[in-house]
């Protein structure tokens, strides 16, 4: 990024982006946590429905379609969450750089 073009308008855009994505970020974070619990429940459910020894039942639970579906749902939610999280972190870095540059300008360092 060209730091000469980092002005108040760009910082305002960053703040707007952060404000507009607050709820989505929180919702996706909650969904990721919820689906992580769903993975455990799917595995436990498949384990309880299986027959055999503990090790065999564990392997059957991990190989079950219900467990695979839960993993897939979690992965999809996690990818969406990380995408918005990374975008928000980028905007936060823009704001942090702006603060540093502004401070340096006030002190006469730049």
Residues of each region from the PLM?
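Short A/G/S/P-biased low-complexity tracts
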Residues: 12-15, 64, 97-106
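Short acidic DE-rich linear segments
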Residues: 1-5, 104-110
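Short, glycine/alanine-rich amphipathic alpha-helical segment
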Residues: 51-80
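Short, charge-rich amphipathic alpha-helices with coiled-coil/heptad character
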Residues: 1-23
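Long amphipathic alpha-helical coiled-coil segments
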Residues: 29-32, 36-37, 72-105
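Extended alpha-helical coiled-coil "stalk/arm" regions
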Residues: 29-60
């Amino acid at each position: 990024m060209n730091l000469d073009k980092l002005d108040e308008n760009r910082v305002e855009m960053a703040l707007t982006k952060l404000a507009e994505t607050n709820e989505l970020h929180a919702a996706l974070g909650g969904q990721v946590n919820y689906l992580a619990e769903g993975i455990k429940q799917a595995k436990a459910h498949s384990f309880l429905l299986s027959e055999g020894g503990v090790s065999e039942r564990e392997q059957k639970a991990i190989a079950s379609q219900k467990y695979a579906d839960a993993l897939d749902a979690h992965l999809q939610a996690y990818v969406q969450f990380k995408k918005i999280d990374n975008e928000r972190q980028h905007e936060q870095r823009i704001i942090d750089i702006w603060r540093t540059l502004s401070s340096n300008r006030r002190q006469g360092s730049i």
